[in-house]
Amino acid sequence: MGMTIVEKILAKASGKKEVSPGDIVMANIDVAMVHDITGPLTVNTLKEYGIEKVWNPEKIVILFDHQVPADSIKAAENHILMRKFVKEQGIKYFYDIREGVCHQVLPEKGHVAPGEVVVGADSHTCTHGAFGAFATGIGSTDMAHVFATGKLWFKVPETIYFNITGDLQPYVTSKDVILSIIGEVGVDGATYKACQFGGETVKKMSIASRMTMTNMAIEMGGKTGIIEPDEKTIQYVKEAMKKHGTERPFEVIKGDEDAEFAEVYEIEADKIEPVFACPHNVDNVKQAREVAGKPIDQVFIGSCTNGRLEDLRMAIKIIEKHGGIADDVRVVVTPASREEYLKALKEGIIEKFLKYGCVVTNPSCSACMGSLYGVLGPGEVCVSTSNRNFRGRQGSLEAEIYLASPITAAACAVKGELVDPRDL
């Protein structure tokens, strides 16, 4: 029996010829990432155990994205702690408050490549599976072990394959696809399984759209999300590495044709419509027309799910087409990274957002984490392009968050209420 792409990557990383689901392996780590929230916990754990040197300062990426600039004395103290650690350890790849969200910055700086094992002290590290890597989130204590040894144990996960075929309808995006999948599978339906996305629809998707898919694998319990690499992937990775001086050899790994999957879902893309993930669970997915008409207070366009140039283009196109946003709606726009921000500036997108009264923030986690920007008050309703709508995620426990695509979110900003973008 053949192996899936995830099984092959873990076999290679652990020095084995083959592995099977359920096997325990000790894998060599290619890239380890922490940010300003999880990094201090990792550093303090290293100190507690008397570890004075990291295993490889060139394989560690440290980045500030959650509380940037520092929004409290505690946040500032954490930044100071991490900057000191970077200097003491000679960490080569450190991105201070200026660069953006970790899950956008890592691939665009060339830190993720096909066939690699990438771990991050953040649950949405699964995003990087869009590049054919085994990427997963881990805790800060496990990360301390990685910093010290360069290794981590894994139980080889089973793989669920999502075969997505057909053409997406107008106003439907990969965000609608992944929300529809989560609505079908459930928030725990893929617990500790690798969620592999494939089929002709995925092949046609841009890298940005693929990242939206893998980003949300964790929202159905997935150990990782992954897409087998193709020419699009290889071109993106090579260009990013060349641009930022992070070139290194990598191996393009694909699964065997006779690999065995735990489950296979057949997804007909042409039947997917614009949807919302309604409060207060990501799998509470309803077609947009089912819940249309509910007044809203805020729209957030950004995050590691949908803050890329492609997303900003889609959103401003809707807003511009319909002459602006509703008077009673606040719109917070946060580009995912400085590079994406600069591209949007060059295209005039940022100017247009400002023209129509949107608030454009620095690249960061922004309103997604209920800190710094766009905190919701009691009873307020927000349409967000982010990945979680749990109670209290963006502020008050009494607020409501509806997850949607950038197109649908922008349409809601125009209308001032929940709406199917096809009905504007």
Curated annotation (Swiss-Prot):
Comment on activity versus temperature: Optimum temperature is 70 degrees Celsius.
Binding-site list for [4Fe-4S] cluster: C304, C365, C368
Enzyme Commission number(s) of this protein: 4.2.1.33, 4.2.1.35, 4.2.1.31
One GO BP: isoleucine biosynthetic process
Record pathway: Amino-acid biosynthesis; L-leucine biosynthesis; L-leucine from 3-methyl-2-oxobutanoate: step 2/4; Amino-acid biosynthesis; L-isoleucine biosynthesis; 2-oxobutanoate from pyruvate: step 2/3
Gene Ontology molecular functions: (R)-2-methylmalate dehydratase activity; 3-isopropylmalate dehydratase activity; 4 iron, 4 sulfur cluster binding; maleate hydratase activity; metal ion binding
Keyword Iron: yes
Complex and partners: Heterotetramer of 2 LeuC and 2 LeuD. Cannot form a complex with HacB.
Family per similarity comment: Belongs to the aconitase/IPM isomerase family. LeuC type 2 subfamily.
HAMAP family the record matches: LeuC_type2 (MF_01027)
Function: Enzyme with broad specificity that catalyzes reversible hydroxyacid isomerizations via dehydration/hydration reactions. Catalyzes the isomerization between 2-isopropylmalate and 3-isopropylmalate, via the formation of 2-isopropylmaleate, a step involved in leucine biosynthesis. Catalyzes the isomerization between 2-methylmalate and 3-methylmalate, via the formation of 2-methylmaleate (citraconate), a step involved in isoleucine biosynthesis. Also displays malease activity, i.e. catalyzes the hydration of maleate to form (R)-malate.
Protein name in UniProt: Isopropylmalate/citramalate isomerase large subunit
Source organism: Methanocaldococcus jannaschii (strain ATCC 43067 / DSM 2661 / JAL-1 / JCM 10045 / NBRC 100440) (Methanococcus jannaschii)
Organism taxonomic ancestry: Archaea, Methanobacteriati, Methanobacteriota, Methanomada group, Methanococci
